[in-house]
């Protein structure tokens, strides 16, 4: 009895387990669906998404069927269940469901496109190859609320082009992204934007002029700086001489400079240098490239300057004392200017740059952000670069057009000069005939039959061309039958006369078409020609058309250059 009771208990528990439905974890899926639909029906997307905007405008009440959303690829990845989508959108702040729960629409009507859209958008380049929307949102989301992301792709391969546009909610957020995320690596190109800056590895004249103007301005600035430095050096020399003789009589800087004449003896200067070396023996050696200074200058540059000034003030502050203090101030200023030589100035600028870089890094660490090597700039700046690129493209295409027209004219002139008189009329008649198509001539077509598949069209033509001139070979690959068209009946007859030799070598059977067979074949020629002419052609316009023309000319020139030139004995 006990065993039976246990069995019944086990069966009941199993039934209960089966009856209990498995808990489906759809909370994250519902959140993802709501986020995706809110984005699709948001202001930022609808102003750019023409298809969805048209679907909303088509319906009178602005409702869109949920089945349309299910057809989108991103929604297919999340779910294909319309009821689940309706469940996810019940608490949405952007869209609302109809009474049946099968259609959705925006709660608020779509307004006009905002004017500050470009100012709120940033351009990003040097992105990783397999970049995604979620990656960009994660990186740029730390600077503000990302409203829209556009990643352009190549049509042929579908790979990302390496740059993207990120739209923020406010201008301040965009500026913050430019400040903190603009961190291009050292090996990155100097100029931003994926645009060519040269034509045939040479700068374009319009750009060259602007660059030359900039260089001239820089040169003028350098010359002015050099002049000011020279003037300061003169002031320093004069002031130093004045200070050294200040005990005898207080002098002005101009008097000191007059006293120093080029006729001064050279030996005392050498002695002075020796004294300097003896005095500064205990001190560390000065760096290479810096000017050696006299002991008087060193004394003046030492810290106890303010004491001298104080003494002068205490002594009564007479005119002599005031002049000395002025000279000291001038000397202080000039010596500091001299100490800051070009190398030191560069060092200062580098140190400032390092400080700024450190500050940025600190702020980045505060934000809790990883440093990613990206180049970020405003969309307005990128638009200016785009205009520059289009102007360059226009100029290069205009020059290409000119060169192509010149080459054509030259070739026409050459053909006219080489052609004998009266050949122009013959050429025009030939052109008319070619426009009409091949004219019916009897006894010109030879039918070739073979047991094995015939070789290529070129091989057949080469074999027959040894006997007489061939106009056309009508042959498909792998066929055992073909037709050869000759210029005159005599040429066709010559091939027929050599039939025995051809049969021995290639085992081909030849016959000239005549009667109904010939007429049918000529009709086939005309029908095939008409079908070929009526085929839809790819229309090439603008830059593509010019480039194809240039490519043809280049190929023709290379073929001409690669031809083997043979010289006769008399040349």
From Swiss-Prot:
Using the record's annotation, list all stretches that form the HTH La-type RNA-binding domain: 23-117
| Gene Ontology molecular-function annotations | 7SK snRNA binding; RNA binding; U6 snRNA binding
Segments forming domain RRM: 120-198
Keywords linked to the UniProt accession: Acetylation, Differentiation, Isopeptide bond, mRNA processing, mRNA splicing, Nucleus, Phosphoprotein, RNA-binding, Spermatogenesis, Transcription, Transcription regulation, Ubl conjugation
Q: Compositionally biased, Polar residues: which spans? A: 423-432
Subcellular localization:
Nucleus, Nucleoplasm
| CC per GO annotation | 7SK snRNP; nucleoplasm; nucleus; ribonucleoprotein complex
Post-translational modification Phosphoserine, affected residues: 254, 257, 294-295, 335, 349
Primary subcellular site in the record, as a coarse category:
nucleus
Cystine links in this protein are: none
Any GO BP: regulation of mRNA splicing, via spliceosome
Composition bias, kind Basic and acidic residues: at what positions? 1-17, 287-296, 342-351
User: For the region Disordered, what residue ranges are annotated?
Assistant: 1-25, 181-366, 411-432
Q: Where is the xRRM domain?
A: 439-552
Q: How does it assemble?
A: Core component of the 7SK RNP complex, at least composed of 7SK RNA, LARP7, MEPCE, HEXIM1 (or HEXIM2) and P-TEFb (composed of CDK9 and CCNT1/cyclin-T1). Interacts with METTL16. Interacts with RBM7; upon genotoxic stress this interaction is enhanced, triggering the release of inactive P-TEFb complex from the core, yielding to P-TEFb complex activation. Associates with box C/D small nucleolar ribonucleoprotein (snoRNP) complexes.
Q: Which family does it belong to?
A: Belongs to the LARP7 family.
Q: What protein name does the entry list?
A: La-related protein 7
Q: Which organism is it from?
A: Rattus norvegicus
Classification from the root reads: Eukaryota, Metazoa, Chordata, Craniata, Vertebrata
| Name of the coding gene | Larp7
